[in-house]
């Protein structure tokens, strides 16, 4: 039997339409005006002006829509389960909303309206298509002095000559979007450190990503291809292990082509030791010279995967301070102190450090620093610089 929702007077047991008629603020209701079947992806309680609002993100027909409910439906309905739902359209003088009225758990297959793509092409980005596709998750980094995170995936891509290759593609997200994207993977937690732990544990794992939007950006003669997370985007561990795309991604160890950049790819290295120096000039073009040692770097960037004879060498990378953004002297000195602190903490074995860099394709392998991740093993806590 379907459960009927209740609103403000939630324990009254009165039918919704009758309670609305008795409310002090007149409302017009179209009861059960629409029925849907879908999977509850997540739910959230919001407190605005001392009034509670209950929101539900439900996926139906490969789209995630948000609906209002009440405390009873919030208590009854469980994330990850599927429901047959009837909806009310409620209209007042100042607002209109769609609310869950009756709901009943059901069995259903979540079908995708958009078919799975075996590979990406330039057309997907030209048309800004939303795609469902199998990907390898590589890593996430946070840009220094920014609140922006970048997620790096590997995916099969066919160029204009129809030649398939495994390439890197990047996706920009803020903290809230990142938590929402992986909320089902971390059991509904709102702690971003839980997201970082999950992602570190699942580096190089194969996922299926749904409703990710392709985007093309022009900068002079260069074309950059990126992904955008939209409201209906979701990601889950891939179960199609027999597919050709899964096999291609699994067999690729280090993609050197990044379609989100020009003649560079993104790499991450666990650092043994690190040192940095601030270089300033009269033009205000400040940069940090960051040198580090890593046992992994020479293996990962060697074309034949052989190790260098000198694994203990210093590797030079550069972080350019954003000259388009006014950087106060105090902020620059704070960043200088942070780099210095990381060096000392690493030397004293109090933290572990991962560095994220762009690597130029070609002989020089010049590197620019993107981000630094600190890991406190005692607290099991990750923090980006």
Swiss-Prot record:
It is found in: Host nucleus. Residues 26-32 are annotated as: Nuclear localization signal. GO terms for molecular function: DNA binding. It comes from the Viruses. The keyword Transcription applies. GO terms for cellular component: nuclear viral factory. The keyword Secreted does not apply. GO terms for biological process: regulation of DNA-templated transcription; viral genome replication. Its main location: host cell. Keywords: DNA-binding, Early protein, Host nucleus, Transcription, Transcription regulation. Single-stranded DNA-binding protein that plays a role in viral DNA replication. Forms a stable complex with the alkaline nuclease and mediates the transport of the helicase to the host nucleus. Belongs to the baculoviridae LEF-3 family. Homotrimer. Interacts with alkaline nuclease. Interacts with HELI and IE1. This is Late expression factor 3. It comes from Autographa californica nuclear polyhedrosis virus.
């Amino acid at each position: 039997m379907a459960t009927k929702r209740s609103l403000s007077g939630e324990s009254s047991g009165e039918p919704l339409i009758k309670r609305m008629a008795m409310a002090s603020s007149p409302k017009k209701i179209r009861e059960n005006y629409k029925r849907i079947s879908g999977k509850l992806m997540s739910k959230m309680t919001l407190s605005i002006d001392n009034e509670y609002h209950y929101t539900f993100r439900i996926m139906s027909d490969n789209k995630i829509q948000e609906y209002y409910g009440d405390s009873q439906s919030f208590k009854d309905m469980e994330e990850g389960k599927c429901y047959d739902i009837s909806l009310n359209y409620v209209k007042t003088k100042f607002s209109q909303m769609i609310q869950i009225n009756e709901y009943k758990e059901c069995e259903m297959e979540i079908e995708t309206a958009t078919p799975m793509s075996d590979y990406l092409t330039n057309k997907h980005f030209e048309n800004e298509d939303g795609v469902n596709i199998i990907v390898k998750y590589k890593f996430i980094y946070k840009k220094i002095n920014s609140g922006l995170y970048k997620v790096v995936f590997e995916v099969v891509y066919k160029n204009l000559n129809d030649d398939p290759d495994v390439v890197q593609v990047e996706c920009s997200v803020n903290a809230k979007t990142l938590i929402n994207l992986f909320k089902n993977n971390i059991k509904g937690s709102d702690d971003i450190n839980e997201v970082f732990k999950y992602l570190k544990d699942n580096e190089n794992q194969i996922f299926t990503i749904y409703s990710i939007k392709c985007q093309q950006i022009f900068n002079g003669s260069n074309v950059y291809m990126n992904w955008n997370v939209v409201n209906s985007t979701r990601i889950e561990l891939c179960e199609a292990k027999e597919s050709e795309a899964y096999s291609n991604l699994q067999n690729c160890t280090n993609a050197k082509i990044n379609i989100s950049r020009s003649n560079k790819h993104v790499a991450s290295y666990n650092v043994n030791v690190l040192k940095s120096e601030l270089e300033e000039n009269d033009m205000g073009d400040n940069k940090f010279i960051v040198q580090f040692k890593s046992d992994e770097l020479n293996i990962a960037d060697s074309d034949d995967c052989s190790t260098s004879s000198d694994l203990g060498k210093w590797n030079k990378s550069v972080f350019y301070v954003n000259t388009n953004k006014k950087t106060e002297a105090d902020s620059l000195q704070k960043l200088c102190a942070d780099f210095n602190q990381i060096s000392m903490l690493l030397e004293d074995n109090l933290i572990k450090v991962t560095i994220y860099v762009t690597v130029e394709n070609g002989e020089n392998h010049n590197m620019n620093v993107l981000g630094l991740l600190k890991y406190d093993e005692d607290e099991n806590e990750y923090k980006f610089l």
